[in-house]
């Protein structure tokens, strides 16, 4: 069923934290959800932003496959530890009021700040690669952890 409503859950990938099965503000695992700047993320018992190290752990301990899932492109991220998986949609980013790179790239915030004019660390993903970079001043996707 396309875009089926699912309950937000935290998936055990065998890592140090559990990862939400959908982006913050989404109603299904393939929806882009909210786009937020680092200082706009306000969470409580729902979870929290992952740290840079937790995002690196996700990169290093999971297999990443670029897929088209019900018309949405992104990565299926499958744990090498227990086989569980999450989908990270290529939601692009927001600059001002305009969306860029939707369906082509994904940008996911972390809670790790760096001493630079740019600020927070983020995961950037495209069909050819994925890795950690310094975030600019744009609004990005948020995937919570517990």
Which role fits each region the language model picked out?
Residues 5-7, 12, 17-48, 52-146:
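C-terminal, surface-exposed recognition/capping segments
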């Amino acid at each position: 069923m396309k875009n089926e409503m699912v309950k937000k859950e935290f998936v055990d990938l065998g890592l140090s934290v559990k990862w939400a099965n959908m982006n913050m503000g989404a109603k299904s695992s393939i929806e882009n959800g909210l786009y937020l700047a680092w200082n706009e993320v306000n969470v409580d018992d729902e979870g929290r932003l992952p740290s840079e190290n937790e995002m690196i752990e996700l990169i290093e301990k999971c297999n990443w496959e670029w897929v088209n899932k019900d018309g949405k492109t992104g990565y299926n991220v499958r744990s090498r530890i227990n086989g569980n998986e999450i989908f990270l949609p290529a939601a692009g980013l927001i600059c001002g009021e305009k969306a860029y790179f939707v369906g082509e790239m994904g940008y996911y915030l972390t809670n790790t700040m760096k001493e630079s004019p740019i600020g927070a660390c983020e995961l950037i993903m495209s069909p050819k690669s994925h890795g950690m970079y310094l975030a600019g001043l744009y609004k990005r996707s948020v995937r919570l952890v517990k």
